[in-house]
Amino acid sequence: GKYAAQLAEKELPALEDFVEYGSQRRINIVVYNNFNDLQQSNVGLGIDWQNTGGVTKFVNNKMIVYFNGDHENLKKQIRQGIAKVLLENLLFGDDLGEFASNQALLDLPKWLTEGYIMYAAENWSPALDDQLKSALLSGNYRNFYQFAFDKPELAGHAFWRFIADNYRKDNVTYFLYLARIYKSLNSASLKVTKKKFKEVLNEFMEKEADKYYKDLRGRRNA
């Protein structure tokens, strides 16, 4: 537990800089010995594991993590948890009343918020690139929404990386901030990209798939 707290203190400033938002909330962390212990605990039994995806969970304002001897995995869980708190503060405010009313008004897709948490917590990697490549070249997805429905965290992480690469990294958090101000993803998208939100999603599918097709053709011709 002490190691997890030290890790959280160490990671917090960099993530606050990234999200451009400080946390006023005290973050409590509960550490389990392994994932099975967490799932079987009273806390774990209250979580719908099938539908909650891979982002670090919170129960009664406590960050729930597990440590199985893999320090990098624990660090990733804690970074995700901190990013989640900071993102919720950014979108919904620190005050509980403000939080509830903003949450009701701002209904963002899960892939978008969880993807942002992944993007903030973990650098893009060759493994993620391989996953994206096989998803986009599989022919299973006619549009972004089908992809995001099937693989929300991967789609969301890749989307924010796409925004950073094509529309400046500074605009990643700004995009979400504008969505909060305007209560609209379309307005935020028009401001950042000069395109409607759906057009940006189509652009993502075309550009990313095209990049992988070119890569494949290049290898065949080599």
Where on the chain are the PLM-derived regions?
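Soluble non-cytosolic domains of exported or imported proteins
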Residues: 1-10, 69-77, 107, 111, ...
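Zn2+-dependent metallopeptidase catalytic core
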Residues: 1-30, 34-35, 79-82, 86-89
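Short, solvent-exposed loop/turn elements at domain surfaces
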Residues: 1-3, 37-41, 127
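Sec/Tat-exported extracytoplasmic proteins
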Residues: 11-19, 81-82, 86-94, 116, ...
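Charged, often glycine-rich, active-site loop that binds/positions anionic groups
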Residues: 35-52
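Zinc-dependent metallopeptidase catalytic helix centered on the HExxH motif
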Residues: 52-127, 134, 173
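Long, well-structured alpha-helical subdomains associated
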Residues: 126-179
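Beta/coil-rich, acidic/histidine-enriched accessory regions frequently appended to metallopeptidases
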Residues: 10, 145-150, 174-222
